Curated annotation (Swiss-Prot):
InterPro entries: DA_C. Pathway: Secondary metabolite biosynthesis. GO terms for molecular function: isomerase activity. Keywords: Isomerase. It catalyses: (2S)-3-[(2S)-3,5-dioxo-4-[(2E,4R,6R,8E,10E,12E)-4,6,12-trimethyltetradeca-2,8,10,12-tetraenoyl]pyrrolidin-2-yl]-2-hydroxy-2-methylpropanoate = sch 210972. This is Diels-Alderase cghA. It comes from the Eukaryota. Diels-Alderase; part of the gene cluster that mediates the biosynthesis of the tetramic acid Sch210972, a potential anti-HIV fungal natural product that contains a decalin core. The PKS module of cghG together with the enoylreductase cghC catalyze the formation of the polyketide unit which is then conjugated to 4-hydroxyl-4-methyl glutamate (HMG) by the condensation domain of the cghG NRPS module. It is an enzyme of class 5 (isomerase). Disulfide bonds: none annotated. Belongs to the Diels-Alderase family. It comes from Chaetomium globosum (strain ATCC 6205 / CBS 148.51 / DSM 1962 / NBRC 6347 / NRRL 1970) (Soil fungus). Its EC number is 5.5.1.-.
Amino acid sequence: MSGTPRTMPPLMMDWAEQPNGRAKPRGMVISRVPYLPWYLLGAVRVGGVSNARPNSRPYSAEQADFGRISQTALCRYRSMPVRNPTPYGVGTQVWRAVVLHHLPLTAAMAAAPFISLLQGDQFLADTPIPGSAVIPNSGNLFPKWADKLSPTAVETWLFDAMAEDGSAAFTVSFFRDGSQAPASFRAAINAAWSDGTVWSQHLVVPVSVVTSDGPDVGHGHVAGVWRTEEPQSNDTTRTTASFDVAADLSTTTVVFDAPGRITGSLTHRSLGYPTLPQSDREAEVAPGAYWFRPIAMANATVDLTFHIDDPTNPDKKTEKRMVLGPEQGAFGGMDRSWLPMVWGKEATDALFVRAQAGPYVMAVMRLVSKPHKYYQNTVNAALYRDGKIVSNALRSLPPDRRDTAATADAVRTEKLYDGDGLVAKYRDKNVGYRLEFRSAGPEREKWSFDLRHHQAWWAKPTSRPGPDGTGNSGFVVEVTGGLVGSEESVHGWGMTGEVELSD
């Protein structure tokens, strides 16, 4: 982000709306005012006033350049009617705007017509509220709860990268999580190296802002920033994590500036695999819960520096870099998810996969519901061969389903307990997964891949310790398999996120 942040008191400004609809500035005075609830949000010029009428859409306020422009910023402000508007003539409405907060932005973000800023103690709705609808043929990157976050909702923007040989892997998920308020905004980061080093931290911050430059909320360049309040450039406690996605979904850039923790960037250049949903159903991972891949596969470039705690000296840290690019055949992608309720409330098991083996790319998000929903398997998955989709699996088959009949593309997921692979730390003690993709096409083709745990990545408990303790685990996995009934045998690498929850 550019611009020099500065602290300033709230601003009070008046403007008059005459019967002909023209806005006439009355001038502005800088004064300290008590905090007021706000219901207007927009990009304005500090030192000027907005033409936006009260109750207009929060992220579509027009801008007006009245007076000296002192700082381009994103502002919170409240508009209220001013009594005695007589000096402006009969029929004139006079409104007062009180700027309560400003957040410096890049020029591009300040000019964006669609802005979602959540921060402070006013961002959470009092009761659960619905998110906005799926937009067909869109990455749906603008927040679904743009103005107020539902207290039960979670929105996620996920970016990852991996070396072609599995020697290094990285993932970050940007969360807006109403269930974790007031710590709702975090970037969950995990990294792994072939020497066994792992790094897992959450950057928890008080501010989350996402902008889109249009022409509507479903299309356009999107930028997101998770950050501390107005950090100074020399402030070693500052934390900023940001993402930037091109309007055509061709590129992404993720940047970290958290001194003493993580700095650097991840970039993607999409390979153009077909991914975008054309309907609600194509975006769903379960009824009413959405998870899909705006970028299913991309060339990735990583240049990150991590600060790792010394277990023998809490005051000492060592630096470790991760550098991946074309030389390492680095690949990755981007996932987008939003759920009206934390999926852990409804699910007992989850599996995330992104992997590459020979000409195949596979991407999976699969949930298993809790007993009151009969352990139903639901999924949003895709198998690509040479960049073309061969199984768009929106149907999840139970592990014991072994027949070949298929009326729709589907995937069967089965936990592996025998053979090579690291044993998972928590309840199920599996050594990997078998993915069996099916096509409903004329040939009724079937592909089977074994994903075996090669390196443990992250491991976080989701229950109390014990023999049946559950957890959230990540693995670098070795992939083998191919087309069933043929001599094809491919090899590759991938990553899995495996979550177990109590019933």
